[in-house]
């Protein structure tokens, strides 16, 4: 197992302004046993592919760059760098980038999502 992992910020910078990128940092393929971690770049105007959704696991975002708008159970929040957002399992939510620059965040999912089930479900 690789104990130290790095976000490839160079790949994020080289990607197109309108391109969404997900970099797996910890997943089934890399030996995850308790959670998954992805670094995600969301372009301006982009966001939750499923719209308002929920998950069977807790989802935690840590914002690295930009400002992400979050809606949780009907209440909206603007979250900038250093913000930690917690979506408990089963709670309706969505996220999107309402700003003009891309956002970059870490997404933690715990416990380990079932690979045989869809991760997001529209609600």
Describe the role of every protein-language-model region.
Residues 74-89:
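Short acidic-glycine-tyrosine-enriched beta hairpin
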Residues 33, 89-115:
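Ligand-binding loop in jelly-roll beta-barrel domains
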Residues 39-42, 54-70:
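Short, conserved beta-strand element in jelly-roll/cupin
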Residues 51-55, 59, 93, 105:
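Histidine-centered active-site/metal-ligand motif
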């Amino acid at each position: 197992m690789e104990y130290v992992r790095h976000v490839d910020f160079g790949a994020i910078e080289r990607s197109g302004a309108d391109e969404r990128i997900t970099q797996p940092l910890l997943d089934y393929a890399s030996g995850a046993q308790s959670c998954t971690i992805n670094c995600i770049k969301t372009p301006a105007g982009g966001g939750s592919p499923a719209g308002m959704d929920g998950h069977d696991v807790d989802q935690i975002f840590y914002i690295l760059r930009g400002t992400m708008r979050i809606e949780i159970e009907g209440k909206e929040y603007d979250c900038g760098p250093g913000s930690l957002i917690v979506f408990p399992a089963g709670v309706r939510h969505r996220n999107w980038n309402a700003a003009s620059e891309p956002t970059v965040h870490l997404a933690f999912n715990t416990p380990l999502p079932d690979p045989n089930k869809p991760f997001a479900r529209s609600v």
